[in-house]
Amino acid sequence: MVLMVVVFLLLLFWENELTEDVVLTSIEQLHVDYPQNAVPLRYCNYMILQRVIREPDHRCRKVHVFIHERPQKINRVCTSSKKMSCPNDSDLFCFQSETKFRMTVCQLIDGTTYPACRYQISPIKGFVLVTCDDLGPVDLQGYVE
């Protein structure tokens, strides 16, 4: 009986670990900051470090975008009638938002390397382009100003 409880707890812990990894790489974790964090200075540097955003080979990401809209509003992009080939990958279909979203574009400052990545901040309004699956947005493919 004790062994069954231990096995159950191990399986439960393992399942939570797998689920946690999926959540950490979701579009919401990577790109959504709503309401916008009130970091007075160095917003991009803080957010990218806080969320551990980097390239797979651990280099600084050259450009990263944070969207300052409710997750529900971003989810609705997947029902947009504006469906098109993604600009970066013509094999994928993208959905474009029907309205412009508030965003912050973080552009890597030349000469900075991981983990001391430094970014220039550009607040913009633009239409987002996302890929979707049955559950909603999967990845931010870009934006159109």
Swiss-Prot record:
Decide whether keyword Signal is in the record.
Answer: yes
SUPFAM superfamilies found in the cross-reference section? RNase A-like
Q: Establish whether keyword S-adenosyl-L-methionine is in the entry.
A: no
Q: Where in the cell is it found?
A: Secreted
Chief subcellular site?
Answer: secreted
Keywords (A to Z) from UniProt: Secreted, Signal
| Signal sequence interval, chain numbering | 1-19
Q: Which GO terms describe its cellular component?
A: extracellular region
Name the InterPro entries for this protein: RNaseA, RNaseA-like_dom_sf, RNaseA_domain
The record's comment on protein family reads:
Belongs to the pancreatic ribonuclease family.
What is the purpose of this protein? Does not exhibit any ribonuclease activity.
Q: What is this protein called?
A: Probable inactive ribonuclease-like protein 12
What organism is the protein native to? Mus musculus
